[in-house]
Design a protein with these regions (language model features):
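Conserved, single-site charged/polar hotspot
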Residues: 1-169
């Protein structure tokens, strides 16, 4: 355990030394850099999620390693029935849920029911709804799990950031 702690400390110190006093920039301004723990297999496009062209470097990218991660799929039973997913983005994340005449934003629904991901499907019974989620988080920006896999392949932090963000720093 002590040897592993020493190795981890050495890796952290090296990463800190390589990145200290560096920031990611876009158009001479600090870049908005969201991240999530785990995607559904691809990240989301900022234009679809945020409805703006302000972050053109946040494009959807494949995260194949996320599909096989330990917590890739989870399920949760919630109260009520009659929920319908009415809108999803191109990566499969929920943008809108309807129950009767009520329409709710997909992320608001996620937060309301404390779901681990914004990518989900539903299965309904007489009195309950089972929500099956894929990934952990909102799916926008960098996937921590995929970044870790790229690092294990020997990719530098710069190559990892370029893969997800396509910004210069």
């Amino acid at each position: 355990m002590e040897k592993q702690d020493a190795e981890n400390y050495a890796r952290l110190k090296e990463a800190w030394n390589e990145t200290k006093e560096r920031i990611l920039v876009y158009e001479d301004q600090p870049a908005y850099v969201p991240y999530c723990r785990l995607t559904n297999g691809k990240t989301r496009d900022a234009k679809e999620v945020l409805g703006t062209d302000q972050y053109p470097y946040l494009k959807s990218v494949d995260c194949a390693a996320d599909k096989n991660a330990e917590d890739a799929f989870q399920s949760k039973e919630i109260d009520g029935t009659g929920y319908e997913i009415t809108k999803q983005d191109s990566a499969g994340y929920v943008l809108e849920v309807k129950q009767g005449e009520n329409v709710i934003d997909g992320d608001t629904f996620r937060n309301q029911w404390e779901l681990p991901s914004s990518c989900y499907t539903m299965r309904q019974t007489d009195k309950k709804t089972t929500v099956i989620t894929q990934g952990i988080g909102h799916g926008l920006g960098l996937s921590q799990n995929m970044a870790e896999e790229l690092a294990k392949e020997g990719k530098s932090y710069k190559k990892i950031l370029e893969y997800f963000l396509r910004v210069l720093f």
